[in-house]
A protein has these predicted regions:
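C-terminal capping alpha-helices of c-type cytochrome domains
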Residues: 6-12, 26-58, 128-164
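General marker for long, soluble alpha-helical cores
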Residues: 47, 59-62, 98-101
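Gly/Gly-Pro-rich "capping" loops immediately C-terminal to redox-active cysteine motifs
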Residues: 1-8, 24-27, 83-110, 128
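Sequence/structural segment immediately N-terminal to covalent heme-attachment motifs in c-type
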Residues: 57-82, 144-145
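Periplasmic/extracellular electron-transfer cofactor-ligation site
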Residues: 17-19, 46-47, 70-92, 116-119, ...
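Beta-strand-rich N-terminal accessory domains
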Residues: 162-300, 304-311, 322-348
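Beta-strand-rich recognition/accessory modules
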Residues: 290-291, 311, 319, 323-332, ...
């Protein structure tokens, strides 16, 4: 069941993946065991890994896997630890180490029929006779569900913690009015501002970079890290489908579309944060200056399915004519046009009011919107983000 790399580690260096067992593994050394690794692997092999095609983007697949592992579905966390989090029952093997140790095809076979490989095991059969006990997730497809869990666990210790383990959580739940949470947020500068909506589509705006940096679905924020004791460290979004938007100056004047986007601190590029105001519904509008131009940025939920999106409106009002001005809303490895929109690394951007362009610069795909405008006028663009 172990992959070749982990077999080498065990035979050459030893390992302690089961701290609850009072046993020690000798360190034999590579000179004594070098040929055994290949022999073990070839003797136990039962064929090639079968490819599995996912029906959804990977960020949604991982969210479904997280749901399955947590206390709302298969409850793997009742027996298995998850990095630093103890299981709610017996303390079995850490799930975040599994993909580092195991062979993918063995993982599939074992989950389908644990008793076949370990008679008398406490491991329950979640896919008896190949049928899932959670048919409402990923259409009940057993192969897809197991592959989803494997893909989720490939993130190792960086995998998002399943539901049911953070028992001291202080979850902030938006109601009639959005919640504005100003604190240290993972992936942002220390000037992060998270905004949560009852529509379960949320974002985090970075007052250092003058732009939204994170968007996500589901639960909003767990405030326990910052509201208990001295509140050290950064908090990650509590929900799923967390997507990252580019840092750096949001606006730039480019003499040529071949020119690189400015980097460094936006304050060194003529930007100054001017705070935010709340409308009657409690929705913030962020304000900043870019040289002689005033800029506002408002983000609201956008109703769609299967999960709501976000609607962003950016308005630029210059004191003098603004030429060759561009707004950068996305930067990623992949970008493709689809039904009048542009999809960049899993986020779909639909632009209203302007004609965007996609360019390749420094091996990155950037989505830019022209914001050239005369003095005394305004340039406004509406951006609908779904993911």
């Amino acid at each position: 069941k172990l992959n070749e790399n982990w077999l080498k580690t065990i035979l050459n260096e030893g390992a302690k993946d089961r701290p609850y067992m009072a046993t020690r593994m000798p360190k034999f050394g590579a000179s004594q065991t070098g040929s055994l690794v290949t022999l073990f692997a070839s003797t136990d092999a039962l064929g090639e890994d079968k490819p599995v095609t996912f029906p959804e983007p990977e960020h949604r697949i991982k969210a479904d896997a997280r749901l399955m592992i947590g206390d709302q579905a298969l409850s793997c966390i009742k027996c298995h630890t998850f990095d630093k989090y103890a299981a709610t029952g017996i303390q079995s093997l850490d799930m975040t180490t599994m993909t580092r140790r195991l062979r993918r095809e063995w993982f599939h076979r074992y989950l389908l029929d644990p008793q076949k490989y370990r008679s008398g095991t406490r491991m329950p059969a979640a896919w008896p006779k190949g049928r899932s006990v959670v048919p409402h997730i990923l259409n009940g497809d057993s192969d897809v569900q197991i592959e989803a869990i494997w893909t989720y666990l490939l993130d190792g210790k960086n995998a998002k913690v399943p539901s049911g383990l953070q028992r001291e959580a202080i979850e902030l739940r938006p109601g009639d009015r959005p919640i504005v949470y100003r604190n240290f947020i993972e992936g942002l500068s220390p000037r992060g501002i998270a905004v949560g909506f009852a529509a379960k589509a949320h974002f985090a705006w970075d007052a250092e970079h003058m732009t939204p940096r994170l968007i996500w679905h589901g639960a909003f924020i767990d405030a326990a890290k910052h509201w208990v004791d001295r509140g050290p460290g950064n908090q990650v979004p509590l929900g799923d489908h967390v997507m990252t938007l580019p840092a750096g100056p949001p606006l730039a004047s480019l003499e040529s579309l071949d020119g690189a986007w400015p980097d460094g601190n936006p304050r060194d590029n003529g930007f100054a944060f001017k705070g935010y105001s709340l409308d009657k519904a409690g929705v913030p509008t962020f304000k900043y200056r870019w040289n002689e131009a005033t800029v506002t940025d408002t983000i609201l939920p956008f109703e769609t399915s299967p999960d709501n999106g976000l609607q962003r409106t950016v308005t630029v009002a210059p004191a003098n004519k603004l030429e060759n001005a561009w707004l950068r809303i996305a930067s990623g490895q992949n970008a493709e046009e689809s039904d009048g929109a542009v999809i960049v690394d899993g986020v779909r951007f639909q632009i209203e009011g302007k004609e965007p362009i996609v360019r390749t610069i420094n091996n990155r795909r950037e989505l830019l919107i022209p914001m050239t405008v005369n003095a005394g006028e305004t340039a406004t663009v509406r951006i609908i983000m779904t993911w």
